[in-house]
Regions:
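Active-site cradle of extracellular carbohydrate-active enzymes
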Residues: 141-142, 147-188, 192
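Phenylalanine-focused residue identity feature
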Residues: 2, 46-47, 57, 127, ...
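Elongated alpha-helical scaffolds that mediate protein-protein interactions in large eukaryotic proteins
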Residues: 1-107, 114-131, 138, 146-147, ...
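Structural signature of alpha-helical solenoid repeat scaffolds
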Residues: 57-59, 109, 113-114, 153-155, ...
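Helix-loop junctions that connect tandem helical modules in alpha-solenoid scaffolds
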Residues: 37-48, 83-103, 133-144, 177-189, ...
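Structured C-terminal portions of repeat-based eukaryotic scaffold domains
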Residues: 176-290, 294-314
Length: 314
């Protein structure tokens, strides 16, 4: 599949195609094709053999067949989503949850990021119960397992943007309830990576509907205001990039506007001293913009700059 040999020859395209076709055929005993058996038997292989098997899996999954460039292994996985579930739930093989097989979990992680490249397979995963288990996997205390799960989580939510937006809108409450809980209670690395991903998702135009629902929530804004006061500077910094979306929203609810108005002076003072040692021109400009927006938010009964009464007052 990869060429090599004594002469370090390049891969033979015909042999690659033949291997992809042969491994896509169902077995005679009705137990599935080579793809299925490889997924199911992976934890039982020796370490180096397991790595080779995963490399072969990734290669045959992406190898096109014929003039129409069909992907038989993608089609097979699409028709057998239980195999995708096995791959997603592989973090449970790790030492904290079941069998103490961290290496197998990490190998499955490379396979998960490979299948995420294909929209049909990614759809199965994003709408599955197994996907929500990834919040638990990202909070494992074993750093390698948690980081690998976070890398796969990010790939699933950013590879196919329209699909991800559909999944987030459909599963909004169950997704963000878990996401916010992770931001409050997760470990430092998970919280920092998750905040960074959240700001990226909210600012992506594909997720405009998701963004408007998220920033309409008082609870979400209060969470970001609390994270702005976190002990870790990097958490504060990432929270800032989410909080700015609430402040910049021209269609704030009366409740959100009221909270910002009541905390206006404290927020302006906080921003004035917020990480001024950062040599980041864009960050400085965004801080200045937020400060101007907050200063223009007159409290109820006061007049905003320009002589107009603040929103929500009569």
């Amino acid at each position: 599949m990869f060429g090599g040999g004594e002469d370090d020859a390049p891969p033979d395209a015909e042999l690659q195609t033949a291997l992809a076709l042969e491994t896509a055929k169902p077995s005679g005993d009705g137990t599935g094709n080579v793809t299925a058996k490889l997924i199911e038997m992976l934890p039982k292989l020796f370490f180096e053999t397991r790595k080779d098997a995963a490399a072969v899996f990734n290669a045959i999954v992406r190898h096109p067949i014929g003039s129409h460039e069909d992907l038989p292994h993608v089609q097979y996985l699409n028709e057998n989503p239980q195999l995708l579930r096995t791959i997603v739930e592989a973090s449970e093989l790790g030492e904290e949850m079941r069998h103490g097989n961290n290496a197998a979990s990490l190998t499955y992680g490379t396979m998960l990021r490979e299948v995420a490249r294909y929209e049909a397979l990614c759809r199965h995963i994003l709408f599955s119960d197994a996907f929500l288990k990834m919040f638990d996997y990202m909070q494992l205390t074993t750093f390698e397992l948690a980081s690998d799960a976070a890398a796969s989580f990010r790939e699933l939510l950013t590879r196919h943007k329209s699909l991800a937006a559909e999944a987030l809108e459909t599963r909004f409450d169950e997704f963000f309830n878990r996401f916010n809980a992770m931001l409050e209670n997760g470990n430092y690395v998970t919280r920092r990576q998750s905040l960074k991903l959240l700001s990226e998702l909210l600012l992506d135009r594909s997720n405009a509907g998701v963004m408007m629902r998220y920033i309409a929530s008082v609870e979400n804004m209060c969470l970001m205001m609390n994270l702005l006061r976190d002990e870790a500077r990097s958490i504060q910094f990432e929270a800032f990039h989410v909080f700015k979306v609430f402040v910049a929203n021209p269609n704030k609810s009366a409740q959100i506007l009221s909270i910002l108005q009541k905390n206006r002076e404290k927020l302006v003072a906080y921003l004035a001293a917020f990480q001024n040692d950062r040599e980041d021109e864009q960050f400085a400009e965004e801080k200045a913009m937020l400060t101007r927006l907050l200063e223009r938010m007159a409290e109820p009964g006061e007049e905003a700059e320009g002589g107009e009464k603040s929103a929500g007052t009569s």
